[in-house]
């Protein structure tokens, strides 16, 4: 048994990719996308028919040029999601424009629009996760959407405060990042020799997982943003792990036995009063790494979103 199959005994494996061929090869349960992956996928030959359909849709909808570009971008993300769903039995995560991360109302409106676009193609909302940045506004938008039956995946999650606020809001799933936390600490003080169990990213996810299970929150914990196979194996047993195709291939080729590292707690603790907005902002602000990486992540996704829109604009 290879490590990928071994990992699947304890954890739901999710493909962090927009490449359909890779997704088919590794047979994950779910798939996650983001503006960076959509931008990369848009250049693949296999997606050209979807790209053309996107442009035709935007032209048909009409409106100003800016409106057409936004409609094309939303439609392309959904078209790729629909195609991915042909190859996974579970769900696909589609991301809300990162530039809306500080506008609760716009996050809700965009999420509803994406769900409607999926439904136009016969995809029920039970197969979709709407990805939102884990800002206070994103978390509150998700709380509202969950009440409408629209499940959300809160991403760019780096601090314990973000995770706790998401759990308290009843968010379906959170994606605490491992690799980007590792990057931040490693750049300041190289983690040498490397010990996976001491990796700050691994430690962060373990703490979040244990807290949510001990306090009986229903939020699914999905570790994300991995740099090394060792990080993945150190979190075997986490509810879900979303993994790049490069690391899926490494796991597929290795046959070392996989041991379960995380298990739900048998203890139960009383849930504390939910964090208020000032408490959330203060607790998050106390984590310099999380402040840096959340801001950077939003900026990076915004740049890739703009690049995608520029690509579409050139064809419209």
UniProtKB/Swiss-Prot annotation:
Its EC number is 2.2.1.2. Keywords: Cytoplasm, Pentose shunt, Schiff base, Transferase. It comes from the Bacteria. GO terms for biological process: carbohydrate metabolic process; pentose-phosphate shunt. GO terms for cellular component: cytosol. It is found in: Cytoplasm. Its main location: cytoplasm. It catalyses: D-sedoheptulose 7-phosphate + D-glyceraldehyde 3-phosphate = D-erythrose 4-phosphate + beta-D-fructose 6-phosphate. Pathway: Carbohydrate degradation; pentose phosphate pathway; D-glyceraldehyde 3-phosphate and beta-D-fructose 6-phosphate from D-ribose 5-phosphate and D-xylulose 5-phosphate (non-oxidative stage): step 2/3. The active site is at residue 131. InterPro entries: Aldolase_TIM (IPR013785), TAL/FSA (IPR001585), Transaldolase_1 (IPR004730), Transaldolase_AS (IPR018225). CDD domains: Transaldolase_TalAB. GO terms for molecular function: transaldolase activity. PANTHER family: TRANSALDOLASE, TRANSALDOLASE A. Transaldolase is important for the balance of metabolites in the pentose-phosphate pathway. Belongs to the transaldolase family. Type 1 subfamily. Homodimer. This is Transaldolase. It comes from Sodalis glossinidius (strain morsitans).
């Amino acid at each position: 048994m290879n490590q990928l199959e071994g990992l699947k005994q304890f954890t739901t494996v999710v493909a962090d990719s927009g490449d359909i061929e890779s997704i088919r090869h590794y047979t994950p349960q779910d798939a996650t996308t983001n503006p960076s992956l959509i931008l990369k996928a848009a250049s693949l030959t296999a997606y050209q028919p979807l790209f053309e359909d996107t442009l035709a849709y935007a032209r048909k909808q009409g409106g100003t040029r800016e409106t057409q570009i936004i409609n094309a971008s939303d439609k392309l993300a959904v078209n790729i999601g629909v195609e991915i769903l042909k190859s996974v039995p579970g769900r696909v995560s589609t991301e809300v424009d990162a530039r809306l991360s500080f506008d609760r109302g716009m996050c809700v409106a965009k999420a509803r629009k994406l769900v409607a676009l999926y439904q136009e193609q016969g995809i029920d909302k039970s197969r979709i996760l709407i990805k939102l940045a884990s800002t206070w506004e994103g978390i509150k938008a998700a709380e509202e959407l969950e009440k409408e039956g629209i499940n959300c995946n809160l991403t760019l999650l780096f601090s314990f405060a973000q995770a706790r606020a998401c759990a308290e809001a009843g968010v379906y799933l959170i994606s605490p990042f491992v690799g980007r936390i590792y990057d931040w600490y490693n750049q300041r003080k190289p983690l040498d020799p490397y010990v996976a169990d001491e990796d700050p990213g691994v430690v962060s996810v373990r703490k979040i997982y244990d807290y949510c299970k001990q306090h009986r929150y229903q939020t699914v914990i999905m570790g994300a943003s991995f740099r090394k196979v060792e990080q993945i194996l150190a979190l075997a047993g986490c509810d879900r792990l979303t993994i790049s195709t490069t690391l899926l291939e490494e796991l597929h080729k290795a046959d070392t036995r996989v041991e379960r590292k995380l298990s739900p707690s048998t203890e139960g603790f009383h849930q504390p009063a939910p964090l208020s907005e000032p408490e959330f902002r203060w607790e998050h602000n106390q984590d310099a790494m999380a402040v840096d990486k959340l801001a950077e992540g939003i900026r990076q996704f915004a740049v890739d979103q703009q690049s995608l829109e520029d690509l579409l604009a050139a064809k419209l």
